[in-house]
């Protein structure tokens, strides 16, 4: 089989060996520099196990005593390459879901931690954040994870406030194999956020070939987070962009293309501000469905679609559900949204279409899209 890994130029093969200057402005609800703060210890990991070992060591003081929340802030640069595992999984899609998941767990670590992939690195394992805070995950290329039937998420944020998921590439196959539990678990989610994971920012990620992109809440009783999704590029994905259960979602400057099931699904009385995005070739791009009640509401502002007459121009279609549902097929706002509690400067939807693919994902030196680039 032809390799799925695109050759990388010599310039991009330079590892991100030094942490960037600390920054707490994520363009969203999260305000964190992760581990990149005063007193941070920087380490390099060449494998998944190295990351595990480095985090374990950071839990202990100089005397080997465990410190609650971690002994020191931590910046880990991951230089490993698992292209061979990714390509093998891509060649045997239906052989992955029943395997055990692979992942790094960041549990009860509140001192601050950043995991940043070196350019040219890749991972066939997930990053699972639980009961932690001030965590940043950047420039990680994660794909075709095993364990779809065993909660094998690429990135999972569980009971963890102040998390920033930024400039990653997350990918699998938008396909369902026969015989999987619930007929829905060939691969698990790209980014699931649940529990007490308030103030999270998901930005500049390139997410493609994923059936279930991401939860905002694990059940109808798991509600109430504030999450920002901005400058993400979604292509050939099925649904959950996100599946929002309650709380607030601010989605701005995202590019949604080739959406095969549904896009932003605002449920359980959630409120969404959907601003300056570009939608094309999308089924049910904004909807509230599957619960049959407690429909969420949205404010539509500055998107490329402004009226139903635009649907044919951008290949937007709508479907019904067996339960009561609400689609944005009149393309009007259905509610209100509170004043956004952070500074942000969205570019136009047209600029998102034209420029965002050059900024989202890995190997972009964490560059951000500004109005200057739109001229």
UniProtKB/Swiss-Prot annotation:
Pathway assigned in UniProt: Glycan metabolism; pectin degradation; 2-dehydro-3-deoxy-D-gluconate from pectin: step 2/5
Cited InterPro entries: Pec_lyase, Pectin_lyas_fold, Pectin_lyase_fold/virulence, PEL
Keywords, in A-Z order: Calcium, Disulfide bond, Lyase, Metal-binding, Secreted, Signal, Virulence
Domain of life: Bacteria
Recorded catalytic activity of this chain's protein: Eliminative cleavage of (1->4)-alpha-D-galacturonan to give oligosaccharides with 4-deoxy-alpha-D-galact-4-enuronosyl groups at their non-reducing ends
UniProt cofactor note: Binds 1 Ca(2+) ion per subunit.
EC category: lyase
Chain sites annotated for binding Ca(2+): 151, 153, 188, 192
Disulphide-bridged cysteine pairs: 94-177, 351-374
Enzyme Commission identifier(s): 4.2.2.2
Main location: secreted
Location of this chain's protein in the cell: Secreted
One GO CC term on file: extracellular region
Keyword hit for Metal-binding: yes
GO BP annotations listed: pectin catabolic process
Stored PANTHER family: PECTATE LYASE 18-RELATED (PTHR31683), PECTATE LYASE 21-RELATED (PTHR31683:SF18)
Family: Belongs to the polysaccharide lyase 1 family. PLADES subfamily.
Protein name: Pectate lyase C
Name of the gene this protein is made from: pelC
């Amino acid at each position: 089989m032809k390799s799925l890994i695109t050759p990388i130029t010599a310039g991009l093969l330079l590892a991100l060996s030094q942490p960037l200057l600390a920054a707490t402005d994520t363009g969203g609800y999260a305000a964190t520099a992760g581990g990149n703060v005063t007193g941070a210890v920087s380490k390099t990991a060449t494998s998944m196990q190295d990351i595990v070992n480095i985090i374990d060591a950071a839990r202990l003081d100089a005397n080997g005593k465990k410190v609650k929340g971690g002994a020191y802030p931590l910046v880990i640069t991951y230089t490993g390459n698992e292209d061979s595992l990714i390509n093998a999984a891509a060649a045997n899609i239906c052989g992955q879901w029943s395997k055990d998941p692979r992942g790094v767990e960041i549990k009860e670590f509140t001192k601050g931690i950043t995991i940043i992939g070196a350019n040219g690195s890749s991972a066939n394992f997930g990053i699972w954040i639980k009961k932690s805070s001030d965590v940043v995950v950047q420039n990680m290329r994660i794909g075709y994870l095993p364990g779809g039937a065993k909660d094998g998420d690429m990135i999972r944020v569980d009971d963890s406030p102040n998390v920033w998921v930024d400039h990653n590439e997350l990918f699998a196959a938008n396909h369902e194999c026969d015989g999987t539990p619930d007929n829905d678990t060939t691969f698990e989610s790209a980014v699931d956020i649940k529990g007490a994971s308030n103030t999270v920012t998901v930005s500049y990620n390139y997410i493609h070939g994923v059936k279930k992109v991401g939860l905002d809440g694990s059940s109808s009783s798991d509600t109430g987070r504030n999450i920002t999704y901005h400058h993400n590029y979604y292509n050939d994905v099925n649904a959950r962009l996100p599946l929002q259960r309650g709380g607030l979602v601010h989605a701005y400057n995202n590019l949604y293309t080739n959406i095969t099931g549904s896009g932003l699904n605002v449920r359980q009385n959630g409120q969404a501000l959907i601003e300056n995005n570009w939608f094309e070739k999308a089924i049910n791009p904004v909807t509230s469905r599957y619960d049959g009640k407690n429909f969420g509401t949205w404010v539509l502002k500055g998107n490329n679609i402004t009226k139903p007459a635009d649907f044919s121009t951008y290949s937007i279609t709508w479907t019904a559900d067996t339960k009561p549902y609400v689609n944005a097929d009149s393309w009007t706002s259905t509610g209100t949204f509170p004043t956004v509690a952070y500074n942000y400067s969205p570019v136009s939807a047209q600029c998102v279409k034209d420029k965002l693919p050059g900024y989202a994902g890995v190997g972009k030196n964490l560059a951000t899209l500004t109005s200057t680039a739109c001229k």
